[in-house]
């Protein structure tokens, strides 16, 4: 087999607010139509759709030149909010649309590919250092919002883990 010589990488930081899990946990929003609107108002859904539009030619050629998208999505993965994990997410099983956009075009969530069970291995990246949300004095929603997706032949995902620090950086 030929070694991979080139890859294409996009690093992203999608709009942070309004943050959907806050709307669910602190404002009691449960309507999926309203949650889609929140993702649109934050800019996340338009931003990921714009990225996918930019990526179109590269997606078609990903088997020759693999593509990666990674960064701070500021939204949970649709693969993490399941019936089995609802109690960890304020009762929600909402299917977050931003990550769904990437899997719909054949991209693979690198973490969830290795760690299949979101209940056993949530991979939370927001926010393991904050237990209480200071604005609401309620438990901080714990979610995996920093993600890596990839697409291409001859890519073998050997491991993908979360590393967290011991507190705030000054």
Give the label of every model feature segment.
Residues 1-24, 158-169:
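Structured beta-strand-rich core segments of catalytic domains in phosphoester-bond hydrolases
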Residues 14, 72-73:
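Active-site metal-binding loops of divalent metal-dependent hydrolases
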Residues 20-42, 84:
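A solvent-exposed, charged loop/short amphipathic helix patch at secondary-structure junctions
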Residues 35-63:
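A long, amphipathic alpha-helix that forms part
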Residues 57-68, 74-170:
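Metal-dependent phosphoester-hydrolase catalytic domains
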């Amino acid at each position: 087999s030929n070694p991979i010589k080139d890859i294409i990488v996009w690093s992203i930081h999608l709009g942070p607010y309004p943050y959907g899990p806050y709307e669910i946990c602190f404002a009691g929003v449960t309507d999926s139509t309203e949650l889609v609107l929140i993702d649109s108002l934050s800019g996340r859904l338009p931003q990921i759709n714009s990225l996918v539009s930019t990526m179109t030619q590269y997606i078609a050629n990903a088997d020759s030149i693999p593509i990666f998208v990674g960064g701070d999505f500021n939204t949970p993965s649709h693969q993490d909010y399941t019936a089995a994990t609802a109690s960890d997410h304020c009762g929600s099983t909402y299917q977050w649309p931003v990550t769904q956009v990437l899997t719909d075009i054949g991209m693979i969530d690198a973490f969830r590919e290795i760690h299949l069970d979101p209940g056993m291995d949530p991979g939370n990246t927001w926010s393991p250092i904050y237990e209480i949300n200071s604005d609401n004095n309620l438990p901080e929603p714990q979610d995996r919002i920093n993600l890596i997706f990839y697409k291409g032949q001859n890519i073998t995902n050997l491991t993908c883990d979360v590393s967290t620090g011991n507190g705030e950086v000054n």
